[in-house]
Amino acid sequence: MSKLLSYTARIILRNSRITVRQLVRGFAGFVSGQRNAPQPAYGRPVPGLLRQKMVSSIGKRSMFIQTQDTPNPDSLKFLPGVEVLGKGNTYDFPSGTAAHCSPLAKLLFRVEGVRAVFFGSDFITISKEESAEWSLIKPEVFAVIMDFFASGLPILHEARPNADTEILDDDDETVMMIKELLDTRIRPTVQEDGGDIVFISYENGVVKLKMQGSCSSCPSSIVTLKNGVQNMLQFYIPEVESVEQVFDDADRMADKEFERFEKNLKQKEPAGAPVGIGGGPN
């Protein structure tokens, strides 16, 4: 398997037309399938690049907001058509208590059913509670985003996005290489899915990372981490032996809530009925 990965990587690297996304997905050994096209506001079918013109009542400014599905059915990308944090920058708000540095995040957490908020370069990812409906959440999120950008208020107060991959004076060569690879090859691909990947630590050959945004509770996050990220890091950095995902209290709480919901679902279903949770964003 390792020989096959090495051969594949060398072939890919010789071809300058191959994108970073294709390179990472090539190491992953799986294809997540074609993404659904961006959805227009309120679900109206519009030909071409689906978009809905939305006019803010503040100022007379107009805004085009698109939504795009992610691999996680409980997370949705909102693309306002303007810069959010700027190229390559992200900021994660796993709970309302973490939103103290962002007026926009505070407003979004006031929308009933919103569980987590994530800011990217030009998008905002909203993660909802399992029982909440996108048909009810989306109109309120659209209104909050439009009104906020029309107000001219800063998105963040005294916060530095992406500080995890900043090169420090005491970083050794291996750590610097890991951070560089995360920023240039891995992070851009993960951000396309409405999430991010954060460097936590490196010690004794083990790289510890944290998934954010739509990737934090996505069922395929472990596969992405092991088959994609780990293989790429090991290929370029022989010192890396394994990659582990780090969970915080918010992640553990979300997992417990999901387990409780799934347990209740199984108890309500008649014997012999297929068990599963279906459906994506409405």
From Swiss-Prot:
List of residues binding [4Fe-4S] cluster: 215, 218
Transit peptide: 1-27
Localization terms from the record: Mitochondrion
The UniProt record lists the keyword Iron: yes
Main location: mitochondrion
GO biological process, one term: iron-sulfur cluster assembly
Chain segments carrying region NifU: 178-246
Annotated GO CC locations: mitochondrion
GO MF: iron ion binding; iron-sulfur cluster binding
Keyword entries, A-Z: Iron, Iron-sulfur, Metal-binding, Mitochondrion, Transit peptide
SUPFAM superfamilies with a match to the protein in the record: Fe-S cluster assembly (FSCA) domain-like, Hypothetical protein SAV1430
Protein family per UniProt: Belongs to the NifU family.
Summary of the function given for this chain in its UniProt record: Molecular scaffold for [Fe-S] cluster assembly of mitochondrial iron-sulfur proteins.
Protein name: NFU1 iron-sulfur cluster scaffold homolog, mitochondrial
Species name: Drosophila persimilis
